[in-house]
């Protein structure tokens, strides 16, 4: 299976979740929306991140596919699977001045998509290219990408903060960790806002990723 074929599978997953969300919002009951909305939205966020991991580090996606094609069981957790904590978010134990430390082993940092290291190498420069691209962006559309970011150097911090908050909020709607009535917290307006934030984040990640220099 080629990398292109894997992208098609992931794209079809996103397309399916988008259709389900659209049907929920437009014609579903409020109860179905509040129960299923967070699950569909988190699926879109996770799948988008998987695609972008493959864009930056194709080997990681190919590795997962190779392992799953040989042996895959729904009865046990796959140690090779892409995870939010390991592959997307990564660690944040270093100060800005200690990102590159000769005393640390290479494997201690990992290669998470939203790690501070990847932020400095890929995301921050790509975001700067985006907001400087006057041939593409108008002043009005540029405001959609400036958001709450004071400078391009802080873009990765914005991504980490927003993605962490969004993932946590969506997960609470998916897992049974609440001991109070979830409808009190996840009413229709809350779920609609989470869905909106999910699409905004996925769109932002996708747009900025096109400005990443992988040459």
Segments predicted by a language model, with ranges:
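Aromatic-enriched hydrophobic runs in primary sequence
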Residues: 1, 43-55, 63, 167, ...
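Non-transmembrane, amphipathic alpha-helical segments
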Residues: 2-10, 25-40, 151-162, 183-197
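Short non-catalytic regulatory patches outside canonical folded cores
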Residues: 2, 46-160
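Short, well-ordered alpha-helical segments
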Residues: 159-171
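Charge-enriched, short contiguous segments at helix-coil
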Residues: 156, 172-212
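Short, charged/polar, low-complexity loop and linker segments
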Residues: 17-28, 142-152, 172-180
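Short, hydrophobic, well-ordered secondary-structure elements
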Residues: 10-26, 30-60, 170, 195, ...
């Amino acid at each position: 299976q080629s990398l292109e074929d894997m992208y098609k599978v992931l794209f079809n997953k996103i397309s399916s979740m988008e259709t389900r969300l659209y049907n929920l919002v437009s014609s579903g009951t409020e109860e179905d929306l509040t129960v299923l909305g967070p699950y569909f939205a988190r699926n879109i966020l996770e799948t988008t991140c998987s695609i972008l991991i493959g864009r930056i580090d194709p080997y990681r996606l190919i590795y997962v596919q190779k392992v799953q094609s040989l042996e895959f069981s729904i009865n046990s957790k796959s140690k090779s699977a892409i995870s939010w904590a390991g592959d997307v978010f990564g660690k944040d134990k270093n100060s800005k001045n200690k990102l590159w430390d000769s005393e640390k082993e290479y494997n201690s940092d990992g290669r998470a998509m939203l790690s501070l290291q990847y932020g400095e190498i890929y995301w921050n420069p790509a975001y700067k290219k985006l907001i400087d691209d006057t041939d593409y962006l108008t002043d009005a559309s540029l405001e959609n990408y400036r958001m709450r970011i004071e400078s391009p150097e802080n873009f990765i911090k914005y991504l980490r903060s927003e993605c962490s908050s969004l993932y946590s909020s969506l997960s609470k709607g998916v897992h049974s960790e609440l001991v109070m009535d979830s409808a009190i917290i996840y009413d229709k307006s809350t779920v609609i806002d989470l869905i909106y934030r999910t699409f905004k984040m996925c769109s932002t990640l996708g747009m900025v990723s096109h400005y990443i220099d992988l040459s």
